[in-house]
């Protein structure tokens, strides 16, 4: 148990360092067994974001998102995750991706998204991002990200997938995530 706890702390420090490398002040959260006031990593520049950090070889992404949502206390839930020898990935609810696209979630666009609410539909309207959709099989997120990277060419890429309850999730590299945060990717059409 001590080894896995130390691995968790190390992962939290690494994710904190990712924030710092991208110009955000961040620190490890106060750990109180997953209470809403204790995200794994706190970024004062993003007070409405809750980050659950995982460093495991075989992550149950659905369970991690359930935990992140539960612990988020009304904030936007994200799972920052990686496995050995892979870069950091960030997974979020699809609606959060639309907000990162700086889309107005009202009006005609929201009505169309509510009908399908799939990342492919949103990404289909944005020519500078490739959205790889994975359905109908057990998800290996790292294989899906590698495939999306190959197919995207020079475009940004995300992987859309559904959790065990059918909710759409989106996973992207931390590099893409931080570019979205800084607004460095082209705006939506």
Model-predicted segments: where are they?
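Catalytic phosphate/metal-binding cores of nucleic-acid and nucleotide-processing enzymes, i.e., regions
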Residues: 1-189
């Amino acid at each position: 148990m001590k080894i896995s706890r130390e691995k968790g702390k190390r992962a939290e420090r690494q994710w904190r360092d990712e924030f710092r490398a991208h110009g955000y002040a961040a620190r490890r959260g106060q750990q109180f067994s997953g209470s809403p006031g204790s995200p794994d990593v706190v970024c004062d520049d993003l007070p409405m974001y809750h980050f659950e950090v995982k460093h495991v070889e075989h992550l149950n992404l659905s369970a991690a998102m359930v935990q992140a949502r539960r612990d988020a206390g009304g904030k936007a839930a994200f799972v920052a995750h990686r496995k050995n020898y892979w870069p950091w990935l960030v997974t979020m609810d699809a609606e959060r991706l639309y907000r990162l696209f700086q889309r107005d979630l009202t009006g005609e666009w929201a009505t169309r998204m509510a009908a399908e609410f799939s990342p492919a539909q949103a990404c289909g309207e944005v020519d500078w991002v490739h959205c790889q959709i994975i359905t109908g099989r057990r998800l290996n997120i790292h294989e899906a990200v590698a495939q999306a990277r190959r197919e995207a060419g020079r475009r940004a890429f995300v992987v859309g997938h559904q959790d065990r309850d059918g909710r759409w999730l989106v996973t992207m590299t931390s590099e893409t995530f931080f570019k979205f945060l800084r607004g460095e990717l082209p705006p939506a059409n």
